[in-house]
Amino acid sequence: MRSTLLAFALAVALPAAHTSAAEVPLPQLRAYTVDASWLQPMAPLQIADHTWQIGTEDLTALLVQTPDGAVLLDGGMPQMASHLLDNMKARGVTPRDLRLILLSHAHADHAGPVAELKRRTGAKVAANAESAVLLARGGSDDLHFGDGITYPPANADRIVMDGEVITVGGIVFTAHFMAGHTPGSTAWTWTDTRNGKPVRIAYADSLSAPGYQLQGNPRYPHLIEDYRRSFATVRALPCDVLLTPHPGASNWDYAAGARAGAKALTCKAYADAAEQKFDGQLAKETAGAR
């Protein structure tokens, strides 16, 4: 039952990444289990001159290195903290160097290790009000999944508004609210370089609605309207490179190494595909209600 709940809660019908025989997967939690690829360690993968994927083969955690310290966007599952710190060390980043943690949303597979990372590094967390509330509850009383996918709670240190910017070491991170998958879902954009040339990176949150009641949802009455706005928001992002919390959603394959982003989607293609799937889910729900 617990596995089934998590499958509805977090899995978004993505292709599993290939696992590596050289790396032993991180252990499953006792409370619930996830696909093994979500726990498959990987070495840091370079996305741009200062941006690295340091999570697992099927969960994104982005490290952005600046002259004034590092920024982490998402952390994956609760048991990933030590793996992330090891990958930071491989990039020359000490625990004290981690200054800021940003979130796509506050589900267990993206905010799971935040409490431990804060304790071990002293990093501050910035999130919008909706994500901050869910983070402080450790994912409990989720709008769709109740207490099925909890994790150690943590407090946000800074509440951000839509369009707000945070600058670390000359790199400007902009928050773009894209409510839907959760009310606090957020895309983050910044400009890095590749071989000295500017590249605009968009880290856009999930646009899936796995098992959600879309119409007449008593806990989220404006869900459909929020999703529609978020599809438009993602299409309009400054976006030379798109990454997503679950890499398969944007056609990244982290296990492919240097060719990991060879088939990556544009922001427009990502939003278009997600909206088409959403419309199909909505039509099926409507038909079932007749």
Swiss-Prot record:
Its EC number is 3.5.2.6. Zn(2+) 1 binds at residues 105, 107, 181. Transmembrane segments: none annotated. Unstable below pH 8, unless zinc is present. It holds the Pfam family Lactamase_B. Its cofactor is Zn(2+). It comes from the Bacteria. Binds 2 Zn(2+) ions per subunit. GO terms for molecular function: beta-lactamase activity; zinc ion binding. Inhibited by Hg(2+) or Cu(2+), and by chelating agents such as EDTA and O-phenanthroline. Reduced enzymatic activity in presence of cobalt, nickel, cadmium, and manganese. Zn(2+) 2 binds at residues 109-110, 246. It catalyses: a beta-lactam + H2O = a substituted beta-amino acid. Homotetramer. PANTHER family: METALLO-BETA-LACTAMASE DOMAIN-CONTAINING, METALLO-BETA-LACTAMASE DOMAIN-CONTAINING PROTEIN. Confers resistance to the different beta-lactams antibiotics (penicillin, cephalosporin and carbapenem) via the hydrolysis of the beta-lactam ring. This is Metallo-beta-lactamase L1 type 3. It comes from Stenotrophomonas maltophilia (Pseudomonas maltophilia).
